[in-house]
């Protein structure tokens, strides 16, 4: 009896995944393509520290109990062509009780434009660029997130040196997601970063019959902007500098 080899098995899995995505997209094509998603961002501070600085002993650190796990919320508004992602200010506070810094991500698929307005450690960065392509690898793993059946995909983040795992909804054929993540054949409802040290997970999904209102972030015309690549290089340098500090990373 002939047994399928690894190449044939892989081809079969690919065909099955393609069929599932095609069926889900066909089923959902007539559904709403506008709405709002609230994500909860959970940060395991100790796990993040271990990921960023694996050679440093963790027993040299001490945190208040409430600092070990940080939770915040952010909102993604989307239409068929635009998105805007922002923290929910009244629920997103830093660990000293102050308001969270700016972190707005806007995209327009029709114009192939993306804009970041991010203030980190008091420094404002404005990104105005074309939407970068993300090379995802879809796997055959599946699970439920916020009431939706999701498939898994991985992305090799060469800037931070990590493998990112995304879970996208088969019945929401819109290529968006939280923060800067996009480019899958379904809405990203969960993102796992830094070896599970930080997780973005959809908590509520509200669809709309009419397009939600989305405004592109405004900034002074003379403000210097940068490309996505330049911003990524800036973040990488910032992370490396933070690692060298006596106190290490701050989350």
Which sequence ranges carry the predicted segments?
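Extended soluble regions of mature proteins
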Residues: 32-251
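Bacterial Sec-dependent N-terminal signal peptides
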Residues: 1-37, 248-251
């Amino acid at each position: 009896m002939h047994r399928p080899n690894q190449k044939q098995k892989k081809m079969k899995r690919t065909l099955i995944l393609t069929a599932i995505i095609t069926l889900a997209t066909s089923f959902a094509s007539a559904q709403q393509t506008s709405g709002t998603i609230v994500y909860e961002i959970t940060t395991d501070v100790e796990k993040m520290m271990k990921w960023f600085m694996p050679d440093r002993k963790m027993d040299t650190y001490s945190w208040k109990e409430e600092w070990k796990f940080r939770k915040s919320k952010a909102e993604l508004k989307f239409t068929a062509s635009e998105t805007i992602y922002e923290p929910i200010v009244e629920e997103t506070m830093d660990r000293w009780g102050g308001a969270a810094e700016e972190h707005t991500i806007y995209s327009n698929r029709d114009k192939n434009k993306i804009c970041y307005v991010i203030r980190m450690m008091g420094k404002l960065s404005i990104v105005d660029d074309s939407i970068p392509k993300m090379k995802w690898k879809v796997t055959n793993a599946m699970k439920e997130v916020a009431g939706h059946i999701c498939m898994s995909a991985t992305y090799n983040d060469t800037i931070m040196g990590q493998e990112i795992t995304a879970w996208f909804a088969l019945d929401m054929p819109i290529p968006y997601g939280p923060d800067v993540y996009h480019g899958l054949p379904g809405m990203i409802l969960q993102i796992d970063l830094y070896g599970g040290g930080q997780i973005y997970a959809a908590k509520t999904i509200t669809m709309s019959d009419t397009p939600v209102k989305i405004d592109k972030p405004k900034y002074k015309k003379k403000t210097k902007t940068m490309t996505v690549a330049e911003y990524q290089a800036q973040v990488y340098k910032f992370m490396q500098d933070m690692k060298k500090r006596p106190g290490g990373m701050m989350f």
